[in-house]
């Protein structure tokens, strides 16, 4: 961590910020010698947080300052509560009066910091109630509201309710933005960033050797995800079924997969993902020859008209336009599919050729369909 702040990038960032302060109109060059001390001590501490955690989510420094303030004021309250428990605190009587009660509620709701004033008012109420209860028992009814208020909003004692002291600050102690605090408190080891580097003397030491088994696993996983199977086992069921019907012709497996309704809709560039299409079909929003089809494994025949629910026409048009603007249309409509984007109607014309077939891998007999495209 100390080495990081000696880095050129940190020094460059520090000089830029310092130059920004000097360039202000309110800055006078006579103060330069005084502000050098400010640059070395205070500014370095602020930059230390900003440079290291500037890639964290929005509002990190705000939440950090908020939690530190909460801790500071809670610590003051604990100190007062423990050492000045039996003494009456110097709080104006007007703050604990009934007239100020309504204003006080609004003030405490809007205030972001659990201030020392809030605790002192409640403490003054308890002291006043104890005096009244001992001397004048007939005043119990008039002070009953104060008693209930102090019991409900009683400041937590450390020995009894240790967890409630930092109740409000728990909302801001999150793992993402205050991870360095937790690591410091628990004395955890720092996570070292691993940079892959090649050994200069013997480069073969760092090279990864791919076995045939590893290539097969990559192949099966890539194909199963491409065609919408979350598990490789589900892909093998279709693969074995098509292999039995086509008598071992592996090309027929992919012809069978392209004929499935979910894969057919994916080639039209109308939907964001194949998993979205699965839910879209299951809810009965796809029609084949004006009949609702609610299962994804439906095999299309030639010249069957596929249409959609009219409720989602605007959303589909909007999705097409957004994809065209972002230039994210990866594949045009294939040659074996005919699509009308105005009417939102499509049909399967013929079986795909080997060139027209959409596939995530290269068909090569030498590697037995195991060479992955990169």
Swiss-Prot record:
Xref: Pfam families: S4 (PF01479)
Entry protein name: Small ribosomal subunit protein uS4m
GO molecular function: rRNA binding
Primary location group: mitochondrion
Name of the gene: RPS4
InterPro entries noted in UniProt: Ribosomal_uS4_CS, S4_RNA-bd, S4_RNA-bd_sf
One GO cellular component, as annotated: ribonucleoprotein complex
Domain S4 RNA-binding: start-end pairs: 259-323
Record keyword RNA-binding present: yes
Disulfide bond annotation, renumbered to this chain: none
Coiled coil: none
Keywords attached to this entry: Mitochondrion, Ribonucleoprotein, Ribosomal protein, RNA-binding, rRNA-binding
Entry annotated with the keyword Ribosomal protein: yes
Compartments in which it is found: Mitochondrion
Family listed: Belongs to the universal ribosomal protein uS4 family.
């Amino acid at each position: 961590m100390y080495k990081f702040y000696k880095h050129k990038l940190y020094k460059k960032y520090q000089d830029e910020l310092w130059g920004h302060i000097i360039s202000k109109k309110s800055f006078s060059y006579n103060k330069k010698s005084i502000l050098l001390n400010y640059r070395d001590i205070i500014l370095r501490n602020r930059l230390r947080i900003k440079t290291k955690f500037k890639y964290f989510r929005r509002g990190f420094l705000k939440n950090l300052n908020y939690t530190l303030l909460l801790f500071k004021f809670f610590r003051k309250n604990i100190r007062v509560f423990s050492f000045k428990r039996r003494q009456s605190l110097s709080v104006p009587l007007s703050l604990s009066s009934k007239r100020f009660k309504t204003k006080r509620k609004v003030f405490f709701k809007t205030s972001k910091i659990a201030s020392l004033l809030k605790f002192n008012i409640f403490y003054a109420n308890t002291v006043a109630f104890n005096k009244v209860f001992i001397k004048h028992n007939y005043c119990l009814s008039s002070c009953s509201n104060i008693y209930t208020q102090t019991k409900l909003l009683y400041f937590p004692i450390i020995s009894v309710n240790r967890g409630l002291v930092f109740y409000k600050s728990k909302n801001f102690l999150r793992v993402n933005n205050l991870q360095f605090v937790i690591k410091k408190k628990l004395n955890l080891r720092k996570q070292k960033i691993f940079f892959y580097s090649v050994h200069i003397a013997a480069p073969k030491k760092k090279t990864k050797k791919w076995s045939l088994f590893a290539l097969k696993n990559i192949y099966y996983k890539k194909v199963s995800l491409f065609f919408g199977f979350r598990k490789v086992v589900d892909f093998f069921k279709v693969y074995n079924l098509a292999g039995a019907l086509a008598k071992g012709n592996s090309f027929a497996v992919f012809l069978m997969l392209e004929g499935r309704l979910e894969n057919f809709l994916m080639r039209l560039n109308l939907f964001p993902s194949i998993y979205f299409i699965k839910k879209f079909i299951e809810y009965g929003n796809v029609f084949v020859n004006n009949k609702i089809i609610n299962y994804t494994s439906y095999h299309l025949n030639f010249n069957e008209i596929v249409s959609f629910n009219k409720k989602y026409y605007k959303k589909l048009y909007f999705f097409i336009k957004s994809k065209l603007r972002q230039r994210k249309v990866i594949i045009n409509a294939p040659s074996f599919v005919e699509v009308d984007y105005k009417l939102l109607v499509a049909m399967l014309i013929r079986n795909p050729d080997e060139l027209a077939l959409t596939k995530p891998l290269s068909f090569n007999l030498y590697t037995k369909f195991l060479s992955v495209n990169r």
